[in-house]
A protein has these predicted regions:
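Active-site-proximal loop and beta-strand segments within enzyme catalytic domains
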Residues: 87-88, 93-101, 117, 128-130, ...
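N-terminal leader/targeting segments and the immediately adjacent pre-domain N-terminus
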Residues: 14, 18-128, 156, 185, ...
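Catalytic-site signature segments of enzymes, centered on catalytic residues
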Residues: 129-130, 195-197, 204-282, 290
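Active-site helix/loop module of the DD-peptidase/beta-lactamase fold
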Residues: 134, 153-191, 224, 252-289, ...
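Bacterial N-terminal signal peptides
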Residues: 4-16
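Active-site Gly/Thr loop motif
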Residues: 271-276, 324-377
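Active-site SXXK
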Residues: 116, 133-159, 183, 245-249, ...
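Active-site-proximal alpha-helical segments within enzyme catalytic domains
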Residues: 241-248, 288-312, 366-382
Length: 407
């Protein structure tokens, strides 16, 4: 069955790739005139529920962006013959259904794909198929995947290479002696405070550098940080690591992240809409850990690309076994295990471990969940005003229930 699914996926890609049509003109963006909040309000968690919605679907108005052009021939996403109408599941001893999940977790968009077909597609709060929604840290997993593509192309020789080989500006900083693998595991040992609502945290320092829109300001923040532990020995969630990863990518490939994403994935997989990616400064480098926005279906297509092993038309975009390595729990240099891959979250329950399930996750309730065993992809757009703690229901409980029901 998996073989036939892979062949069908490849055939669909081959069909649209062989055509020579130019991209159809896109409709005007339906939310372009909405009033929005500020990026500081996003991270402070003080937006009203209504303002959070309008802001989250207009983040490309907060900073300069670089476009990731759509494909000239979008990959079809056919609807399943039998749609998923509801799901019942338990979490924390309580019973829930699909509607309660959508309402209690303030889900503004939900896409469920099984074997490449749409089992459920739901938009809320005025969103439509044209809406671009913020990724938040789902962008980190995009950056990780582009690192894999650069390794495949030989632009990056090895994950064991030192960061400073590709980013000499960090020579003499706490990133001296840190490998690319350490960065992907968020285990550089460089001191970092990720607290979103603390204006004095390192995460907010990085955000202020972005707000300044001065070229090189984000890298300057990363180069100023002290060491807290030996490289590769402590996992500490650190958005700054992904800005270092972005610098590695740009210097290794000689291209912007948006251009490289378009060339390697966006155009080849067959995305139907342009995406946008925040920049550190006008015409500068992308923000490697945040600020990406795309349509619900295109997030889903990215999930299908992963589900198909990172292959397009039979060609591997990623190194052999890259996804298995990137999306499974890693072991630190001192032998300690962590429930984290290469900028991907790994399943922690026995069921998720059995299925090899993994996810990209962002604050305010953003998820891209992939279950290779069940052949399921789930995209969740969250409209939670608070960066963390806004979900009533454990999202992974919902994901596991869906994957189980669709086996």
């Amino acid at each position: 069955l998996i073989h036939h699914i892979a062949l069908a996926f490849a055939a669909a890609l081959l069909t649209h790739d062989a055509l020579s049509a130019q991209p159809a003109k896109q409709s005007p963006y339906p939310h372009a005139t909405e009033t929005i909040g500020s990026v500081r309000q996003i991270y402070d968690g003080v937006l009203t529920p209504e303002m959070a919605i309008s802001t989250f679907r207009n983040i490309d108005r907060l900073f300069p962006v670089r476009s990731v052009p759509r494909s000239s021939n979008p990959m079809p996403l056919p609807r399943a013959a039998v749609p998923l109408r509801t799901i019942r599941f338990s979490d924390g001893g309580k019973l829930y259904d699909l509607d309660s999940y959508l309402e209690l977790n303030r889900v503004s968009g939900l896409l469920i794909l099984k074997d490449g077909r749409i089992k459920l597609e739901r938009y809320r709060y005025g969103n439509t198929g044209l809406t671009r929604w913020m990724s938040m840290s789902i962008a980190k997993s995009l950056t990780s995947t582009l690192i894999g593509a650069a390794v495949k192309q030989g632009k990056i020789k090895s994950l064991a290479d030192p960061v400073t080989h590709y980013v000499p500006a960090l020579s003499g900083s706490a990133y001296e002696g840190v490998s690319i693998r350490d960065v992907l595991m968020m285990a550089s040992g460089v001191r970092w405070n990720e607290t979103y609502t603390d204006a004095a945290s390192d995460r907010r320092r990085l955000l202020e550098a972005q707000i300044s829109q001065k070229p090189g300001s984000a890298l300057k923040v990363m180069g100023s940080l002290p060491r807290a532990a030996a490289p590769g020995t402590v996992n500490n969630y650190n958005t700054g690591e992904t800005q270092v990863a972005a610098e590695i990518l740009r210097n290794a490939t000689g291209k912007s992240l948006a251009t490289y994403l378009h060339e390697q994935i966006w155009s080849r997989v067959g995305m139907e809409a342009d995406a946008n990616w925040w920049l550190e400064s006008p015409d500068g480098i992308e923000i490697g850990g945040s600020g990406f926005s795309a349509t619900l279906r295109d997030y889903g297509r990215f999930g299908l690309f992963l589900l198909n092993g990172g292959r397009v038309n039979g060609e591997s975009i990623l190194p052999e076994r890259w996804l298995q390595e990137a999306t499974t729990p890693k072991v630190l240099r001192d032998g300690k295990a962590q429930d984290y891959g290469y900028l991907w979250w790994t399943g922690t329950t026995p069921v998720s471990r059995r299925d090899g399930a993994y996810s990209a996750e962002g604050i305010h309730g953003q998820f891209l969940y992939v279950n290779p065993a069940a052949r399921v992809v789930i995209v969740v757009w969250g409209a939670q005003p608070e960066p963390l703690g806004g979900a009533v229901i454990n999202d992974w409980a919902f994901f596991e229930a869906v994957a189980g029901a669709l086996r």
